[in-house]
Amino acid sequence: ILVGIVDSGVDYFHPDFRNEDGSTRILRLWDQSVAGNPPENYVSGTEYTKEEIDEALALGETEGRRLVPSGDFSGHGTAVLGIAAGNGRASEGVKRGVAYRSDLLVVKMGNPRENSFPRTTELMEGIDYLIRQAVKMRKPIVINVSFGNNYGSHEPYN
């Protein structure tokens, strides 16, 4: 089973997203905020593979983050993914997520606009990407999108 998130990114160095041998559980990470090598059928961002993330992990944090410069500056995506699928390595198995044995897919949404959020189209592309990856891998997927809004009237009679 795959667990996918569209969120603020992920700290891929976090132990809960690594296997016992230290390799990553993240099969793909699409960072929409980093220009460079977008996934097939998309025009923005950079896609990182499991192999690239494993190479970054082997280099250590300083050098590794140069190779795969994707992060989670707010921590929200990392927390969400941990609740959904963290394996508990950081807490010796005490604090693990719901689907702690699953493989992971991550979409980090693009940079927010001034006084705003990333575009809705980026969110939709992220969901589309996750579904396409699951189909390609022939695996079922659960997708978490932890975004909401407060649109519309807030008067008591509207």
Which residues are covered by each model-predicted region?
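Well-ordered, non-membrane alpha-helical segments in soluble/globular domains
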Residues: 123, 157-158
